[in-house]
Amino acid sequence: MSDLVITRPDDWHLHLRDGDALATTVPATARLFSRAIVMPNLVPPVTHTAQAEAYRHRILSHVPAGAAFDPLMTLYLTNNTSPEEIVAARQSGIVYGCKLYPAGATTNSDAGVTDVANVFSVLEKMSDMGMPLLIHGEVVQADVDIFDREKRFIDETLTPLTERFPNLKIVLEHITTRDAVEFVNQAGSNVGATITAHHLLYNRNHMLVGGIRPHFYCLPILKRSEHQLALRDAAASGSDRFFLGTDSAPHPKEKKEAACGCAGCFTAPSALELYAEAFDELGALDKLEGFASLHGPTFYGLPINSGKVRLSKQEWTMPASMALGDSSIVPFRAGETIRWKAELL
């Protein structure tokens, strides 16, 4: 198959950053995606509904003329988040989830939750109100190997959490392991997961063999090929428990190409095309529309988009760099061939 038309997709996990960066990040996503769940890990983090509303307005001010893009906002859970804030967020009509970052797990997560028990009253309110909990599922103890942190989180935190709150809607974000796939498959229908394009296409060998590739470095980190294969099987299975979430996470070039570089891959400029590449490799292009356009809205209880996108097997070259405020950014697969081309119909 060299040409297909799918329902316009959504991105259920996206970092847009703030300030001048929005001039680059917002158009990159609004090019093809109708909606996106916007991560709240700014500095300072988006912890209150009023902050989410202000951030949403800043994002909308950078949507290109004629484009239709709806940012779906989230709140950053802290030890001090109150059940009352959850009520306000739900009633706002613009907040669609709350993000649980174990403190120190990833970029700008220092204000995160230090012990999930600290937010049990908040999770109870979220469960009652149907507000999804979005989880970065890694433990943060220094003595736990970085490649084992997702499995340990599932065993030590997520499993007891789902037992305590059996009706809480949970998205285990950017899953990277066979363990996560098995957990989601065995959990109730209130548990789903997002999968990134880079975790479908690559494993840790691609990042480390023959030289360190800093633009492949992300958190959760790329894993062994056996875990990559499990993710590919899950995405191509047609299960509505798995859906598209790019985790596109931009950082300036100097913060990636450094002695201690930041985690995150800026995949937004070619995100849908990269997913098409992965599904094409799997012989599962017929499953792409469900994964990219149908499963996410169904999980969140939102309408399916009415627009369409055409994907054609047409090669093009990703630019070597792009402007990012006063700096520049190296997009994922910079200077390399992208095998599919997408356009909004």
From Swiss-Prot:
Cofactor names: Zn(2+)
Pathway where it operates: Pyrimidine metabolism; UMP biosynthesis via de novo pathway; (S)-dihydroorotate from bicarbonate: step 3/3
InterPro entries: Amidohydro-rel, DHOdimr, Dihydroorotase_CS, Metal_Hydrolase
Cofactor binding, per record: Binds 2 Zn(2+) ions per subunit.
Domain of life: Bacteria
Ligand binding (Zn(2+) 2): 99, 136, 174
Example of a GO cellular component annotation carried by this entry: cytosol
CDD domains referenced in this protein's UniProt entry, alphabetically: DHOase
Keywords: Hydrolase, Metal-binding, Pyrimidine biosynthesis, Zinc
PROSITE patterns, A to Z: DIHYDROOROTASE_1, DIHYDROOROTASE_2
Enzyme Commission number, as recorded: 3.5.2.3
Catalytic residues identified in the record: 247
A Gene Ontology biological process term: 'de novo' UMP biosynthetic process
Pfam families xref list: Amidohydro_1
Binding site for Zn(2+) 1: 13, 15, 99, 247
Record-listed N6-carboxylysine modification sites: 99
GO MF, any single term: zinc ion binding
Reactions listed under catalytic activity: (S)-dihydroorotate + H2O = N-carbamoyl-L-aspartate + H(+)
Sequence similarity: Belongs to the metallo-dependent hydrolases superfamily. DHOase family. Class II DHOase subfamily.
Subunit field text: Homodimer.
Protein function: Catalyzes the reversible cyclization of carbamoyl aspartate to dihydroorotate.
Protein name: Dihydroorotase
